[in-house]
């Protein structure tokens, strides 16, 4: 009840404390922002890591390439130094050859380069040097190579038949190569190869291929006849147009070969010819028979048995059993290879006369080669 004159309170007192606030509709926005930021940071970090890894890999690759380059340069310079020291080594061994009643020949130090220079190589090369010299590199200073290594293989190009000698333009160079080529191709076991068609569908016998190789390099326009026993150079008129009649014609070069691979352009030189007379074992360059480098004279001390047999048969009279009987040729190749392995790379002959004497069954190795 209200007293007279009193009025009702328009705002009655609240009960139970404060009135609860209305729930906000944007309550999870902060969580979404945090997750979005973390996602963006993760993507940026992943891209940064990929970019950094790529740059690191590139830097490591450039570092290794630089090490490899200078290791290779070092091996070349060390090899030159070793070859330049050959006269000193030969002089030191002269008394030994005098006891054998022959002058000191050129010592093929390059055949031992990988082992002799192993003292400047990695751990594997150090072990090779230790097995050769019996001396550990720990006893010296500035030896060994960390983080890199090299492998040296030096090949004597004068141990092969030089097919570039006719480019000199003289009859003697032509005749010498003709004799070497005919001696190389003369074995009767190769008859099936020369009696069938070549890759161009043509028949090319021994004389045709021999003449084609010489005509490719000599500067004249006359066809050369390969007959090493004629005693003089023979011409058979103008060079033919064989190369102009091919499906893809090209001119005869009449100049020196730029590389041994260019020999594939010459008439009759197919895969069978290449594998038999040019490069029988590509993984072993010392087995290669022909070359476009060198002086032209074959070094029989470093030549492989097949090349030595070609030199012998090129100078032998027709009908020599060694050149006409495959069994005799095989026997000689085996004996020559055995003698070379027995000497462990040391030169067999001090002079050309010693080589001829050995072929006649005389001298230290004559009995083994003529057996």
Regions found by a protein language model. Name each.
Residues 4, 17, 23, 29-371:
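Compositionally biased linear targeting/interaction segments
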Residues 1-8:
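N-terminal acidic, proline/glycine-rich, low-complexity intrinsically disordered segments
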